[in-house]
């Protein structure tokens, strides 16, 4: 996943808020995913903002360390491959 990508939740996926972040359930293939609270701003952005912009904002506010951003992008790419999120073009 690139910092310039914008992502949105797949139409067949529902989020349920939890203490740790959220549960994402895919109605398409009945898979359940645990979404860490640090991923919620990216997954729940509806494609309105670039993932790099969201990451920069979280780093500036102290909610995320800069060193964690590459790992987060890798996790987002994994969620894209599994159909949880899609890159908005």
What spans do the regions from the language model cover?
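Long, charge-rich, low-complexity alpha-helical segments
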Residues: 28-89
